[in-house]
């Protein structure tokens, strides 16, 4: 289940030295996360289904 404060996400570009997922909150804050972590994949799946 995804926290309600997350609106969307995107992956960093291939130009970045480190792969990451960036979540956007309702207050337009950006939160970087490791795409290999289980909780990150779960949040992505939850956002895709909503």
Swiss-Prot record:
Protein localization: Secreted
Main location group: secreted
- Record's InterPro entries? Chemokine_b/g/d, Chemokine_IL8-like_dom, Interleukin_8-like_sf
Gene Ontology CC? extracellular space
SMART domains registered for this protein in UniProt: SCY (SM00199)
The superkingdom of the source organism is: Eukaryota
Q: Which UniProt keywords apply?
A: Chemotaxis, Cytokine, Inflammatory response, Secreted
Q: Which CDD domains match?
A: Chemokine_CC
Q: One GO molecular-function annotation for this sequence?
A: chemokine activity
Query: What biological processes does GO assign it?
Result: antimicrobial humoral immune response mediated by antimicrobial peptide; chemokine-mediated signaling pathway; eosinophil chemotaxis; G protein-coupled receptor signaling pathway; inflammatory response; positive regulation of cell migration; regulation of insulin secretion
What is the protein's known function? Chemoattractant for blood monocytes, memory T-helper cells and eosinophils. Causes the release of histamine from basophils and activates eosinophils. May activate several chemokine receptors including CCR1, CCR3, CCR4 and CCR5. May also be an agonist of the G protein-coupled receptor GPR75. Together with GPR75, may play a role in neuron survival through activation of a downstream signaling pathway involving the PI3, Akt and MAP kinases. By activating GPR75 may also play a role in insulin secretion by islet cells.
Query: So what family is this one in?
Result: Belongs to the intercrine beta (chemokine CC) family.
* Entry protein name: C-C motif chemokine 5
């Amino acid at each position: 289940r995804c926290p309600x404060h997350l609106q969307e996400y995107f992956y960093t570009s291939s130009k970045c030295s480190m792969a990451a997922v960036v979540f956007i909150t309702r207050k337009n804050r950006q939160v970087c996360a490791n795409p290999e972590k289980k909780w990150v994949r779960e949040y992505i799946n939850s956002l895709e289904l909503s």
